[in-house]
Amino acid sequence: SCFIGGNVAENAGGGRAVKYGVTGRYIIGLEVVTPEGEIIHLGGKRVKDVVGYDLIHLMVGSEGTLGIFTKIYIKLLPLPAKKVNLLVLFADISTAVAVVPKIITFGKIIPTAVEFMDKTAVELACQYLNEHLYSGEVGAMLLIEIDGSDENQLVHEYEIIGEMCQ
């Protein structure tokens, strides 16, 4: 778990940064208490604010060294209507790793997240969950998430990703 102030202070990303980017991308305004005790207001509810220095993004990621956030204005996105998770097994690590740039640079598909697990991580996860996810020799696994509003488009995208993984 986390708090939004910490996310902004660290400019956190997380697993879905592949598609959605880091926290700073969505910060449109801040109220900050400076180390001197002064309260400053940066940005706000305006869509276009291009005059002067970009102090919002100077503060975002400053880890609290430039001030403490007391108000944060965030641009929110609607939740995607549909989500698909693909679990792809590979014989070895190098094959799994080679697929990731193919997917990312393909251009027509932006995965929400791409998570890599080597054989040891897969085995430990299976033990912990008391599950058996695969048969045969698996050297690595990718968990690829895609999301969107059009189910047919998602089906098309995961079929393309599946072909890239072969």
Predicted ranges, named:
Residues 1-166:
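Noncatalytic alpha-helical scaffold of FAD-dependent oxidoreductases
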